[in-house]
Regions:
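Non-catalytic scaffold segments within catalytic domains of secreted glycoside hydrolases
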Residues: 1-154
Length: 154
């Protein structure tokens, strides 16, 4: 038989889907080990300090009682921060910063949707721009705040 490789939908670079990785609601695979490996490869090649300027996951969030219980985002964040710390402390990669993509919910550049939410702050607007525009801290807000305050402690 012929080998079939399924495409990893949504990822910036099209490639084979890893059957062992979980995916977001939009098909982006969640791969903290891949981030660590990438940091090592880039640092090994260029030998300059690295700064991660965009990392995050889009998800469908539900506002309940003026917050979002986004444990899936917290897990993603903790796994990726742990991988970065391992790259720094165990692999000696010089990575001096990490910034989440979209700290507040914004319209997705890739899909034009508001329902694809990245932020730690929920914005009460739908895909058509209807809603109050009010902002609500998600559960992940406090986790990210603590990570910043403690320089990466999780």
């Amino acid at each position: 038989g012929k080998n079939v490789i399924n495409s990893a939908d949504g990822n910036l670079l099209d490639g084979g889907r890893n059957p062992y990785l979980k995916s977001t609601d939009w098909g982006w695979q969640i791969d903290p080990l891949g981030l660590r490996i990438s940091l090592n490869l880039i640092y090994d090649r260029y030998q300059i300090p690295l700064f991660i300027s965009e990392n995050g996951m889009g998800a469908i969030d539900q506002l309940k009682n003026n917050t979002v219980e986004d444990d899936y985002r917290i897990d993603y964040l903790k796994q990726h921060v742990k991988a970065i710390k391992q790259a720094i402390e165990e692999d000696y990669v010089d990575c001096f910063g990490y910034a989440w993509w979209g700290p507040i919910d914004i319209i997705s550049a890739g899909t034009g949707e508001m329902k694809k939410r990245y932020g730690f702050v929920y914005v009460d607007l739908d895909d058509q721009g209807h809603g109050t525009g009010k902002r609500y801290k998600k559960k992940s807000f406090e986790v990210y705040k603590k990570i910043i305050e403690t320089n990466g402690e999780i």
